[in-house]
Amino acid sequence: MKYLLILLILNSFTLLSHTEDKSHASAQWQIDAYGSAAPDFIGNYATIIGGNGEILHKGTNGWTCSSANARPFPEMGWSSAHEAMPFCLDENSMKFMNH
């Protein structure tokens, strides 16, 4: 019984410490990271532009999210969402930025 209890405790630590190993250059990581610059009700429905300028997610609410980091997009992606410096703009802000 003691061994079973120890096994269950060790297994629970393993389950709790599991982190999803997602490449920071993947489309899904970029969608999650860049969309996090706005509240969920905006970021979840925004168009997401990836590090290479490609549209990764076509939004439905007129907002656009991307990385504001001016350095070239790293081959392995940004090390964190903080390093990517995500931002989100609505349609009018995008027009202002493009002029």
What spans do the regions from the language model cover?
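Sec-dependent N-terminal signal peptides
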Residues: 3-12
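Bacterial Sec-dependent signal peptides at the C-terminal "C-region" and cleavage site
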Residues: 12-21
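Primary mode marks residue(s) on the alpha4-beta5-alpha5 output face of response regulator receiver
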Residues: 20-99
